Swiss-Prot record:
Gene: MRS2-E
Protein name: Magnesium transporter MRS2-E
Compartment(s): Membrane
GO molecular function, one term: magnesium ion transmembrane transporter activity
One cellular component term from this protein's GO annotations in UniProt: membrane
Ranges of biased composition (kind: Basic and acidic residues): 258-268
Alphabetically ordered keywords of this record: Coiled coil, Ion transport, Magnesium, Membrane, Transmembrane, Transmembrane helix, Transport
Amino acid sequence: MERRAQPVSAAVAPVTGRRKGAAASRKWMVVPAVGEERRVEFGKHQIMKMTGLPGRDLRVLDPVLSYPSTILGRDRAIVVRLQGVKAIITATEVLVPDHDDVLLASFLLDLRSRLSLPDAAPSTNPAAADRGNGTEQGDQGSVPGLAISGAGNAKIPPFEFKVLEVCLEHACKDLESQTRSLEKEAYPALDKLGSKVSTLNLDHVRNLKSRMVDLSGRVQKIRDELEHLLDDDMDMSEMYLTRKLSFQGLSGSLSRADSHKYASVDHDDDREEEDHDDETESGRESSVYVKPDIEELEMLLEAYFVQIDGTLNTLYHIREYADDTEDYINIMLDEKQNQLLQMGVMLTTATVVVTAGIVVVSLFGMNIHIDLMKDPETPEMVRMSNMHFWETTFGTVAGCIAIYLLAIYAGRKSKILQ
């Protein structure tokens, strides 16, 4: 029995390993700056090696985990999770998790249309082509979409900003569309509830308020994320991937040129070395206080910040209208409750008065020796007895009515009743 159990466990082990390997890899849609898009299956460690991202940043894109909207700028990539848009943006390509989703198909369609525009092609800068030697040209030419101004003043936005703009535009349009749909449905439902309070209308408004709270939370999160980026210049500077890539190439070329140029320089003059060190140190200190050039990204984020803030204001107005409708309904219900309480007071007063009349009738029903209770002996006494009966009856009723009216008057005078 033991010999038979060993091959089974050995056969199960490779299957488990393959399952773990399959679970660690995912399909990605790779859209490069130049070339055709392709579907590739990458593992987690491959993505980390390609983009330089830590594992915690990749968990932001995990469809199983629930993460809020996030934009993370890293050294070699930008991680974006906005609504249904999930992407890893580098200086040369964008990686999108491949799964069957309507939002993903719409996002890829918008991305293709944006990258197919004339400014989406790799920039061929004539001024840069005439500059320097072949090494510098090769370093600059290897970076697609490099945002270096040519003869004109306009700059071509780098590839990562084009993709980031598509992500922001897609998320903002989706939230704005949901807000407009909610607005068209909310105002008539609230007006209908204000005119007629019913269980069906209350349930409809409750569902609308749940949608509004959920939508407001998502819009608020994107707004806070954009506000956080706009407040931090260093975070925005980290998102200039193409610039950092080009600076790495230029710094490598300059370092090689400097090493060749100053290889034969005499370093015996200590004074020149001290002056050079002082200038370098002062340059470093002054560079700390220089604001990075982030105007292009700042304008992009501000535009979508204004748009998402307008969407949030629309939701705020809907919430205010819902609160006003709720206050109006509460006032109506309070008025109805006051009317019922007044009716209860009037009915209680009438009950007390009628009870007093019944007590009077009970007193007259007792066997007491008074002239009113004597049996009439003559027709004249019969007539007088009948007249006394009706006088007593009408007097009792009139007295009860008078007491009731007096009680109502006292209640109105004391403003207990309206």
